[in-house]
Design a protein with these regions (language model features):
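Alpha-helix C-terminal capping segments
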Residues: 67-76, 120-122, 288-291
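Conserved phosphate-binding/catalytic region of the ribokinase-like
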Residues: 1-9, 14, 28-34, 177-180, ...
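A glycine-rich helix N-cap at a beta->alpha junction
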Residues: 95-112
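Conserved beta-alpha-beta core of the PfkB/ribokinase-like small-molecule kinase fold
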Residues: 154-234, 250-252
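Conserved phosphate-binding/catalytic loop of the ribokinase/pfkB sugar-kinase fold
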Residues: 104, 108, 119-164
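Glycine-rich phosphate/adenosyl-contacting loop at the front of the ribokinase-like
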Residues: 1-80, 90-91
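Hydrophobic beta-strand scaffold residues
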Residues: 77, 103, 185-186, 243
Length: 330
């Protein structure tokens, strides 16, 4: 695996985030459930933006955030995701390339505009997302750079894209190429509502194609309709080689075969915004995994990266991640 050109290649939604600080009343007035992601059409997105107030514009997308984190750590990262040839598409492409990730998916010249996500951050640091998927949902097998996929130690798939039939086909095609070339396949479940919409097909994907599964407590219990986190642990155990399951302030649990590792969280400052926590956990974990670190160390790397990003507004760390690792993990 050391001869691969990329440590991790990710496939996901190419989105520009608009982060806005809001209160619970705003969520109630717009019938939004705190801490979840809701899909909206372009008209709904425009109305929400107009009423939300000024925001911070930054490139996002769950898998894109993870790959940006891996690149910031010094890993060799590539990303596949569709944008339109518009202003937001140019912003997305510039930002992910600027952190050192390879991004060469051609921009669409017609059709829906580049995806955007309004992220409402409440005073308790919870984020509630309203996402217009736009051009990103049009990703299909023709958009895949299969040479890049074949050259990845790990192919990382974003569960949010599972809402698109074309993207499902792209996922399966990419996973088959990755595995046939000796790579591993990792999946992030992304959102509990997304899991509930596609429970059976997600279970089949995990059982048949996934080596490393990332999920939070809500997502993993939704996947197996479990009554508790502990029950979900036993249901996922053995279905894939590795499961890395995050639990917010309770840290994370990493499973592999009969092994179970409990990873404490890192508290690096006041909690500001949890938007990129899961994405950066996956970045740290996969960075460690592609360097041959043991699973407990991988979990610690993920926990530290997540601990850093939640102390700031926005999903991509503004601090030096290599310096952070050197300071806390040696």
């Amino acid at each position: 695996m050391t001869t691969k050109s990329f440590d991790v290649v990710g496939i996901g939604n190419a989105i520009v985030d608009v982060l806005v600080q809001a209160d619970d009343a705003f969520l109630d007035n717009h019938n939004l459930t705190k801490g979840t992601m809701a899909l909206v059409d372009e008209g709904q997105a425009e109305r929400l933006y107009a009423s939300a107030g000024p925001g911070l514009e930054t490139s996002g997308g769950s898998a894109a955030n993870t790959l940006a984190g891996i690149a910031q750590l010094g890993g060799r990262a590539g990303f596949i995701g569709r944008v339109r040839d518009d202003q937001l598409g140019a912003i997305f492409a510039h930002d992910i390339r600027a952190v050192g990730a390879r991004y060469e998916t051609p921009a669409a010249s017609s059709g829906a505009s580049t995806a955007r996500c309004l992220i409402l951050v409440t005073p308790d640091a919870q984020r509630t997302m309203c996402t217009y998927l736009g051009a990103s949902v049009g990703l299909d097998p023709a958009d895949l750079d299969l040479e890049m996929v074949a050259q990845a130690q790990v192919l990382y798939l974003e569960g949010y894209l599972w809402d698109s039939d074309e993207a499902k086909q792209a996922f399966i095609a990419a996973a088959d190429v990755a595995r046939s070339h000796g790579g591993k396949v990792a999946l992030s479940l992304s959102d509990a509502f997304c899991v509930e919409r596609h429970r059976e097909s997600f279970q089949a994907l995990v059982d048949g194609h996934v080596d490393v599964l990332f999920a939070n407590e809500m997502e993993i219990t939704a996947l197996y309709k479990s009554n508790s986190f502990e029950e979900a642990l036993e249901q996922v155990r053995g279905r894939c080689a590795i499961a890395a399951l995050t639990r917010s302030e309770q840290g994370s649990t990493v499973l592999s075969g009969d092994q179970t590792f409990t990873i404490p969280p890192y508290s690096l400052g006041p909690l500001v915004d949890t938007t990129g926590a899961g994405d950066l956990y996956a970045a740290g974990f996969l960075f460690g995994l592609t360097r041959g670190e043991d699973l407990e160390r991988c979990g610690q790397l993920g926990s530290l990266c997540a601990g850093a990003v939640v102390t700031q507004l926005g999903p991509r760390p503004q601090c030096s991640l290599p310096d952070l690792l050197a300071q806390h993990l040696g």
